[in-house]
Amino acid sequence: MQHKSRAIIATLCLVTASVGASSGRLAAQSAPHLVPASIQNAQKETLEQLGSLAAKPGAVGVEAGKVLVLLKNHAARENEFILPPLTLLPYLADGKVTPDMAWALPMIDRVKAEREQIFNEHAELTEALNGLIVAATAANDQDAKEFAENAAADSLADMEILEPTILLIGETLRSKLPAPH
């Protein structure tokens, strides 16, 4: 329970910092662009859990180590250009589109251009997570198995929900911003 309380407090601190940093300048963020605090917190927690699993002896540790390498690389790419446009969602949901949001368009264009590569990264990550599930099942490590199953579901959600959402953000911006965006 104490761990969850700390996670909630950390999330609130990140949200407060994000709101404070963005007040007075709607979406005119300077590079590097922010990633939504909830996603930052989830990434951090996932990488910490995976690090603990990778430190385990035997096949579970080996397979978790493989996933950790893939996930760190993918998370770095996500933080670079995939996730920052999501910070615009609260504004878009309120019907607010301003010219200073155009910073997101090159990132969104990159997501669109690299869809196949992003898909392949998720497929490789899912394959590695399946290896962790097999190792965890053989080792009777229910925690590792559940972690891998949940991480695989998160990866699928990225492809089914996150990527299309980012592309819709781009379409919304392009339809409401003045040309040449």
Annotate the PLM regions:
Residues 2-6, 13-15, 20-181:
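Small-residue-biased structural context
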